[in-house]
């Protein structure tokens, strides 16, 4: 179950990296005389309202989506692990940290991201920051549960008796046990971040309109979707394939890394 999604995701990553060579023209090049062109050898996906080549914009959109998704997954995992470990080992900080995490999780992540972007402004950095902050509680609670499950294990007591300090215990016994669940969770966060970025851009609260993100392309195409449905179809198709591949990869990793799940024969 992992191979297919992994190959699909690898193809999208290659496409994003090779966007300058795969794109037929500059994704931001305007040509008013060529606006709303149909599919042709010159414009494989046609052109948009401003005469920009849709194929090139969709290709570059993969780069934007993957950068946001991977960066948010990495940052949310790092900060979530740190907060989760501190909460799991500190009996007096744990209630405070968990109430903060519960409060953040009580707010829908997309609404929290919209509020943060509205306060900080629309840019790639601010969008990544806003989505990361909304996703950190998911990792923090997961890591805390792992820490609580192993904190009372006999080998932890043996390590303490043997003179191991907190840092050594965390590094040698706690962090290795968080790798599998956090890796799986990171794939879901990556997909969630891509969807959040697309939603933010679609409603005008995300990346600037000049950035060729899939959300921006869909937002621009919705005005003429009845006469030019391809302006929405192609970016939505690539976004759907991307999200589906990452979620299926996460499911495959969960089945492979979680010994409690029954294995497929």
Functional labels for PLM-detected ranges:
Residues 1-28, 100, 179:
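N-terminal signal-anchor/first transmembrane alpha helix
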Residues 15-50, 203-211:
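Hydrophobic alpha-helical transmembrane segments of membrane transport/permease proteins
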Residues 19-22, 68-102, 114:
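Transmembrane-helix boundary motif in ABC transporter permease subunits
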Residues 44, 48, 88-89, 93-150, ...:
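Generic hydrophobic transmembrane alpha-helix motif, especially the helices
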Residues 52-67, 71, 91-98, 148-152, ...:
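Amphipathic cytosolic juxtamembrane alpha-helices at the membrane-cytosol interface
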Residues 55-69, 118-138, 230-239:
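Loop-to-helix entry region at the N-terminal start of transmembrane alpha-helices
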Residues 105, 116-121, 131, 146-147, ...:
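Glycine-rich helix-loop "coupling/hinge" segments at transmembrane-helix boundaries
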Residues 133-134, 180, 184-190, 229-265:
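C-terminal transmembrane helix and the adjacent membrane-cytosol boundary/short C-terminal tail
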């Amino acid at each position: 179950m992992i191979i297919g999604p992994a190959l699909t995701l690898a193809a999208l990553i290659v496409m994003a990296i090779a966007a300058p060579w795969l794109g037929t023209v500059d994704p931001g090049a305007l040509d008013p005389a060529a606006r709303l062109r149909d599919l042709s050898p010159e414009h494989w996906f046609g052109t948009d309202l401003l005469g920009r080549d849709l194929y090139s914009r969709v290709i570059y959109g993969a780069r934007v989506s993957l950068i946001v998704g991977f960066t948010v997954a990495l940052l949310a995992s790092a900060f979530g692990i740190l907060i989760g470990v501190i909460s799991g080992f500190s009996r007096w900080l744990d209630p405070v940290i968990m109430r903060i995490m519960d409060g953040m999780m009580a707010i829908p992540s997309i609404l929290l991201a919209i509020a943060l972007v509205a306060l900080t402004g629309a840019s790639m950095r601010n969008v990544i920051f806003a989505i990361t902050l909304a996703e950190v509680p998911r990792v923090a609670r997961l890591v805390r549960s792992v820490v609580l499950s192993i904190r009372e294990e006999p080998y932890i007591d043996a390590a303490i008796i043997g003179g191991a300090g907190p840092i050594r215990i965390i590094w040698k016994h706690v962090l290795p046990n968080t790798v599998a669940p956090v890796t799986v969770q990171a794939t879901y966060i990556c997909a969630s971040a891509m969807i959040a970025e697309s939603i933010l851009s679609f409603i005008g609260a995300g990346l600037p309109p000049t950035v060729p993100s899939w959300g921006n392309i869909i937002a621009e195409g919705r005005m003429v979707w009845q006469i030019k449905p391809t302006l929405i179809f192609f970016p939505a198709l690539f976004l759907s394939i991307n999200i589906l591949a990452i979620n299926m990869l996460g499911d495959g990793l969960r089945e492979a890394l979680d010994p409690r799940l029954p294995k497929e024969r």
